[in-house]
Amino acid sequence: MLNNKRLFTSESVTEGHPDKIADQVSDAILDAILKDDPNARVACETTVTTGMALIAGEISTTTYVDIPKVVRETIKEIGYTRAKYGYDYETMAILTAIDEQSPDIAQGVDKALEYRDKDSEEEIEATGAGDQGLMFGYATNETETYMPLAIYLSHQLAKRLSDVRKDGTLNYLRPDGKVQVTVEYDENDNPVRIDTIVVSTQHAEDVTLEQIQEDIKAHVIYPTVPENLINEQTKFYINPTGRFVIGGPQGDAGLTGRKIIVDTYGGIARHGGGCFSGKDPTKVDRSAAYAARYVAKNIVAAGLADQCEVQLAYAIGVAEPVSIAIDTFGTGKVSEGQLVEAVRKHFDLRPAGIIKMLDLKQPIYKQTAAYGHFGRTDVLFPWEKLDKVEELKDAVK
């Protein structure tokens, strides 16, 4: 008999992973600037490696931010507070190399500076995209958060791994860690069980592998994963190399924007290639990806599809998206053409329209930079709102 089961795997990383440190530092700097200057232009890249961080990019702002102070506070919050961890917020070196935004880019983004503080139609029309590019948003009804199960559980496990470190439950854990979850789907594409869970966590030198494996199951996996999804066939790989003492930036260099699949949908949807962290909302890499998730989530919540992927594309200096594409993977209750028309009618997808619609000039970005930008249960981001459901239903009647 033919076995129609299907496996799909996604991963997440903890806030102490080198690439995630870089994302959080970039977004902490962005938030510090937006708090005093909501109209600032920020493109902030971070590199972390043993004993140092490099902050580079283009920033145009009317405010002053003590960048080294922001960096140190962020590293401290993550948990790199002792030299024996291989990275220490107090003693690390911090290099900065910041320029202003290119005037060639700026003139395409804001032709109408006189409308800068007004939400007028003229300002929205005059604000062009900060770059060309394509962005995707996705939603599915397989979880209550409208996220794929594998990435949702990966984030929940990674967050739990950090929580039990920070609250002292497992005080031998260190900040770096990774999680991977493999979900089995039945022939109707419904998730039925967890096939494999991988957890790799940095730890103190004096703890045994057996204790780590026992504690991670008891304090991280079992309290997080619904018991009906785990059975005797579920495989657990906990620190499968046997040792993970050297970690964080001492073990691997980290860079902003290197965890774009972790940040989004765990590989189940397509990705346009642009990262989010360190970018102000005039950068459509970030704001349009948030808008695309907002659109897709409302379509699925409205019952118009079981799965939905939305693609938006832009030209630099042009306000209107050059294309809007929707794929419901055969699960749509109405045609994809009808959905596109409804989206054009009820969502303003011009860059300034997105910023206004989702209130994106707020300093909310640091909290997005670990454990996913979408489907979070610990914080409600504006692009997760379900306030367009009735409008979409009415539009396709």
Curated annotation (Swiss-Prot):
<feature type="binding site" description="in other chain">
    <location>
        <begin position="176"/>
        <end position="178"/>
    </location>
    <ligand>
        <name>ATP</name>
    </ligand>
</feature>
<dbReference type="InterPro" id="IPR022636">
    <property type="entry name" value="S-AdoMet_synthetase_sfam"/>
</dbReference>
<keyword id="KW-0067">ATP-binding</keyword>
<dbReference type="GO" id="GO:0004478">
    <property type="term" value="F:methionine adenosyltransferase activity"/>
</dbReference>
<feature type="region of interest" description="Flexible loop">
    <location>
        <begin position="101"/>
        <end position="111"/>
    </location>
</feature>
<dbReference type="InterPro" id="IPR022629">
    <property type="entry name" value="S-AdoMet_synt_central"/>
</dbReference>
<keyword id="KW-0554">One-carbon metabolism</keyword>
<protein>
    <recommendedName>
        <fullName>S-adenosylmethionine synthase</fullName>
        <ecNumber>2.5.1.6</ecNumber>
    </recommendedName>
</protein>
<keyword id="KW-0630">Potassium</keyword>
<dbReference type="GO" id="GO:0006730">
    <property type="term" value="P:one-carbon metabolic process"/>
</dbReference>
<dbReference type="GO" id="GO:0000287">
    <property type="term" value="F:magnesium ion binding"/>
</dbReference>
<keyword id="KW-0963">Cytoplasm</keyword>
<dbReference type="GO" id="GO:0005737">
    <property type="term" value="C:cytoplasm"/>
</dbReference>
<dbReference type="GO" id="GO:0006556">
    <property type="term" value="P:S-adenosylmethionine biosynthetic process"/>
</dbReference>
<feature type="binding site" description="in other chain">
    <location>
        <begin position="258"/>
        <end position="259"/>
    </location>
    <ligand>
        <name>ATP</name>
    </ligand>
</feature>
<keyword id="KW-0808">Transferase</keyword>
<feature type="binding site">
    <location>
        <position position="252"/>
    </location>
    <ligand>
        <name>ATP</name>
    </ligand>
</feature>
<dbReference type="Pfam" id="PF02772">
    <property type="entry name" value="S-AdoMet_synt_M"/>
</dbReference>
<feature type="binding site" description="in other chain">
    <location>
        <position position="17"/>
    </location>
    <ligand>
        <name>ATP</name>
    </ligand>
</feature>
<comment type="function">
    <text>Catalyzes the formation of S-adenosylmethionine (AdoMet) from methionine and ATP. The overall synthetic reaction is composed of two sequential steps, AdoMet formation and the subsequent tripolyphosphate hydrolysis which occurs prior to release of AdoMet from the enzyme.</text>
</comment>
<dbReference type="InterPro" id="IPR022631">
    <property type="entry name" value="ADOMET_SYNTHASE_CS"/>
</dbReference>
<feature type="binding site" description="in other chain">
    <location>
        <begin position="243"/>
        <end position="244"/>
    </location>
    <ligand>
        <name>ATP</name>
    </ligand>
</feature>
<feature type="binding site" description="in other chain">
    <location>
        <position position="101"/>
    </location>
    <ligand>
        <name>L-methionine</name>
    </ligand>
</feature>
<dbReference type="GO" id="GO:0005524">
    <property type="term" value="F:ATP binding"/>
</dbReference>
<feature type="binding site">
    <location>
        <position position="252"/>
    </location>
    <ligand>
        <name>L-methionine</name>
    </ligand>
</feature>
<feature type="binding site">
    <location>
        <position position="45"/>
    </location>
    <ligand>
        <name>K(+)</name>
    </ligand>
</feature>
<keyword id="KW-0479">Metal-binding</keyword>
<dbReference type="InterPro" id="IPR022630">
    <property type="entry name" value="S-AdoMet_synt_C"/>
</dbReference>
<keyword id="KW-0460">Magnesium</keyword>
<dbReference type="Pfam" id="PF00438">
    <property type="entry name" value="S-AdoMet_synt_N"/>
</dbReference>
<keyword id="KW-0547">Nucleotide-binding</keyword>
<dbReference type="Pfam" id="PF02773">
    <property type="entry name" value="S-AdoMet_synt_C"/>
</dbReference>
<comment type="subunit">
    <text>Homotetramer; dimer of dimers.</text>
</comment>
<dbReference type="InterPro" id="IPR002133">
    <property type="entry name" value="S-AdoMet_synthetase"/>
</dbReference>
<dbReference type="InterPro" id="IPR022628">
    <property type="entry name" value="S-AdoMet_synt_N"/>
</dbReference>
<comment type="pathway">
    <text>Amino-acid biosynthesis; S-adenosyl-L-methionine biosynthesis; S-adenosyl-L-methionine from L-methionine: step 1/1.</text>
</comment>
<feature type="binding site" description="in other chain">
    <location>
        <position position="58"/>
    </location>
    <ligand>
        <name>L-methionine</name>
    </ligand>
</feature>
<comment type="similarity">
    <text>Belongs to the AdoMet synthase family.</text>
</comment>
<feature type="binding site" description="in other chain">
    <location>
        <position position="283"/>
    </location>
    <ligand>
        <name>L-methionine</name>
    </ligand>
</feature>
<feature type="binding site">
    <location>
        <position position="279"/>
    </location>
    <ligand>
        <name>ATP</name>
    </ligand>
</feature>
<feature type="binding site">
    <location>
        <position position="19"/>
    </location>
    <ligand>
        <name>Mg(2+)</name>
    </ligand>
</feature>
